Structure formats: structure tokens, C-alpha cells
């Protein structure tokens, strides 16, 4: 059985990146929550 984590910078950015977050209402809520918490890094 192969490992489940097959790193890809492009896929990571497209799925969890800033633009992916801002594209949906839920994603914007995630960003707002992370801002409220004072996270240094908002997205991947």
C-alpha cells in the first residue's frame, strides 16, 4: 500500500491556498477565524 501523503506544492496551493479560501463563504469564515485568533499564517 502506498503512502497517503504524496506532496505536491501546486495541489496544496489550489486546495488550501488563500485564493481557494476566499472563493467560498466557508473559506472566508476560516480566514476570519484565523485572523481573529492572530495566526501568523492564514493559509497554505
UniProtKB/Swiss-Prot annotation:
Top-rank taxon, per record: Bacteria
Gene Ontology CC annotations of this record: ribonucleoprotein complex; ribosome
GO molecular function: structural constituent of ribosome
InterPro entries, per the entry: Ribosomal_bL34 (IPR000271), Ribosomal_bL34_CS (IPR020939)
Keywords: Ribonucleoprotein, Ribosomal protein
Biological processes per GO annotation: translation
HAMAP family: Ribosomal_bL34
Matches recorded under PANTHER family: LARGE RIBOSOMAL SUBUNIT PROTEIN BL34M (PTHR14503:SF4), MITOCHONDRIAL RIBOSOMAL PROTEIN 34 FAMILY MEMBER (PTHR14503)
Sequence similarity: Belongs to the bacterial ribosomal protein bL34 family.
Protein name (Swiss-Prot/TrEMBL): Large ribosomal subunit protein bL34
Native source species: Novosphingobium aromaticivorans (strain ATCC 700278 / DSM 12444 / CCUG 56034 / CIP 105152 / NBRC 16084 / F199)
Amino acid at each position: 500500500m502506498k503512502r497517503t501523503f504524496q506532496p505536491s506544492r501546486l495541489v496544496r496551493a489550489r486546495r488550501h491556498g488563500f485564493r481557494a479560501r476566499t472563493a467560498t463563504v466557508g473559506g472566508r469564515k476560516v480566514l476570519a477565524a484565523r485572523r481573529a485568533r492572530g495566526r501568523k499564517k492564514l493559509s497554505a
